Amino acid sequence: MTDFTKTPRQGHHTTRCLPLLLTLLMTAVLAACSSRTEPVVINSEADVVGKTIAVPTGSIYDIDMSGRQDIKLERYTTMADMIAALKNGKADAFMNDDIAMSASDMRRHGVKIAFRSDRAFDMGYALRFDEADVVEQFNKFLAEAKESGLYDEICRRWMDAKDPNTVQMPQLEPASGTELKVATSFLMAPMCFLEGDEWKGLEIELLQRFARYAHMKLDIKYYDMAGASAALQTGKADLWSSSLFITEERKKSVLFTDPYYASHEAYYVLDEQATASKGLWQSLKDGVHNNLIVEDRWKFITDGLRETLIISICSLLLGTLLAALICWMRMSRRRWLQSLAAVYIDLMRGIPLLVLLMIMFYVVLAQTGLSATTVAVVSFSMVFAAYVSEMFRTAIMSVGQGQQEAGVALGFTPLQTFRYIILPQAARAVLPVYKGEAVSLFKNTSIVGYIAIQDLTKASDLIRSRTFDAFFPLIIITIIYFLLAWLLGKVLDWAVKGKVKSEK
């Protein structure tokens, strides 16, 4: 009989992993501390020739610069990543709106605007073509706000503030009536940002005032750019608010409101007048303070952890039950059941998990009213069941046919034979590989942010969008994922060990 108990070599697995984890943490902190010192001079468009320029992926700057052969273009998803590229020497400058960073944020991260172009881009909210009445209402509201002076007052309060974080949102009575679902994928002061659990910024205040004007109730959710676009087109969102530039190409896909602001393109470089790099200990303290303590940002982590655990546990339970059903179908004597199960398994194996998740949320289950969390549980359960069902089938088939015949000879019914003879042996055989699949399921939940679920990974994105710290939030969730995956593995190891002892 194979002994599945832990060997001494396996027992030291965690001991070996901890130094690696600490090394990863120290490396990230040192990377955050390091700073490139060579000044980059950009006083005009001509000065960018031959330089490495970072741009936000899919932005108007990406589109404009992608055809140039006289520069090296690097694409990044977040502002934090572009700042890190600047400090690590991977980019000489990055392009973004001139309002992308407040003066206080630029001072804190040691960057400055080297050159601001005269070219301006109008910003507007995007809606579907069937929402022309909402667009008309907003345009009317905006025109009245400009005429009354309210618009200018809002712009002065947010855009002239040295630190947008200190600007207070107006105390407006909550709007009621038809719900206006807003998708945002832009988290930068002073336009749109989270302070604790409160949405703030120029865009948000305009939307709140418009909601009261039009007797609508706001529901704001954060998506990435691709997710926000899909949410708008499928009806998961009614309005897309992300400081979107109004372009002729985008007008073919969405209906824009009148412009509510205009920004200029700017080149950001390291500020040679910035303070010197901090020491390791000071950087650690600042990282904890800025990413966890300020504005109670640790709550993003705890909320994301709760969401991750809910999805993981529910998917594990539902997926295991579904796997048992599919395994029964695969081992059925009815050919049509076997074929149906085989097609299902091949289908789930052939579709990337992220693609399946987005198809289920934005297409298949879009009109059901199910929450994003429920859709995620269903999607993960479907994929988990496809893989685990084959593990179950292989484990059952590993039990000799003679044992089943012996059970029947002893007077057991087929069900009793399976329950008391085959199942215990199959369970002992399948648990080690089941453990690996369960841990993979837990780690794969990190993609649920694509459907606007604030899990652990999305929590780190929210923190990074506020602090522009590229490393610290990621290291925090890396440690959490590692510890939880290790704990899950230990629980399943305990189950295997207990099963072996019970049989002895």
What residues fall within each predicted segment?
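N-terminal hydrophobic or amphipathic helices and topogenic motifs
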Residues: 2-5, 9-52, 58, 146-219, ...
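Short loop/turn segments at beta->alpha junctions
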Residues: 77-78, 97, 224, 352, ...
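Surface-exposed aromatic
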Residues: 119-124, 189-193
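Short amphipathic alpha-helical coupling segments at ligand-binding clamshell hinges
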Residues: 130-144, 202
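Transmembrane alpha-helices and adjacent helix-loop boundaries
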Residues: 279-504
